[in-house]
Amino acid sequence: MSSPDIVGILENTKELDRLRKDQEEVLVEINKMHKKLQASPEIVEKPGDISLAKLKNLYIQAKELSENEVTVSNILLTQLDLLLPYGPTGQQRRKLGVVAEGNDQKRKRMKVDSDVIRLSPSMRNQIEAYASLKGEQVAARVTAESADKDEWFVVKVIHFDRETKEVEVLDEEPGDDEEGSGQRTYKLPMLCILPFPKRNDPSNTQEFPPGKHVLAVYPGTTALYKATVVSTPRKRKSDEYLLEFDDDEEDGALPQRTVPFHKVVALPEGHRQ
């Protein structure tokens, strides 16, 4: 291995470290903005507020840093491949021929594991959280970004792909379908999935205060709609919220409906209904 080769590899490893540190800093700022908007969502309606524009720029930075990290990682892999000896010989070659299929599976696992290692700690934790959702019901947005309205439904997680970061879900009750197509599956990005609070752990569940806008399962359906909190489970001494759903007007007024706390989640930023 020549000195120039070593120098090039070391320079790229330093660049990789810098990119990861920059990503950590950007993610910290993104989390700060999320907390700010969750605490005071009405702030975006104030004249001159640039919170959403700032958040968008932060996501653009995060995306660029992530793409640069992938580029540098690929360069490093190429540099290392060029320095490694070509192929095994003798006993090694015969052994690899016997276990080629097993090694292929191992390489696939290693690729997924290395992808996770390159991610920030917060993103790794998020990926583990989504991987643990298999078999559970979640809220899923099944409409495209370009759609006029967001449609959210209760679905069941059947698989999480760590490599593509996609969640495969099953809509067990697709609604009234004249063709009777039955259950339907979707592959959705993580951003389209909202985990529900744990039914058996109400004490560790975030409670939304009166007046807060939320996304909740409409009684008797598997669809979620925007609603306003009227009363909390704690105040009602029960496990249900008292909510008023948008566009649910009856006789000139919005009826108040009860919804279990484990079917209520935070309203996504930019929700369209």
UniProtKB/Swiss-Prot annotation:
One Pfam match: SGF29_Tudor
Encoding gene (name): SGF29B
Region spans: Histone H3K4me3 N-terminus binding: 171-173, 220-223
UniProt keyword Nucleotide-binding present: no
Site (Histone H3K4me3 binding) residue list: Y218, Y225
Organism: Arabidopsis thaliana
Family statement drawn from the similarity comment of this UniProt entry: Belongs to the SGF29 family.
Principal location listed in the UniProt entry: nucleus
A cellular-component GO term for this protein: SAGA complex
Localization of this protein: Nucleus
Physiological role: Chromatin reader component of the transcription regulatory histone acetylation (HAT) complex SAGA.
Domains: entry comment: The SGF29 tudor-like domain mediates binding to methylated 'Lys-4' of histone H3 (H3K4me).
Tissue occurrence: Expressed in roots, rosette leaves, cauline leaves, stems and flowers.
A single BP term in Gene Ontology: response to salt stress
Chain residue ranges for the region called Histone H3K4me3 binding: 245-248
Ranges where the SGF29 C-terminal domain occurs: 128-273
Name of the protein: SAGA-associated factor 29 homolog B
Matching InterPro entries: SGF29, SGF29_tudor-like_dom, Tudor_SGF29_rpt1, Tudor_SGF29_rpt2
Keywords noted in UniProt: Chromatin regulator, Nucleus, Transcription, Transcription regulation
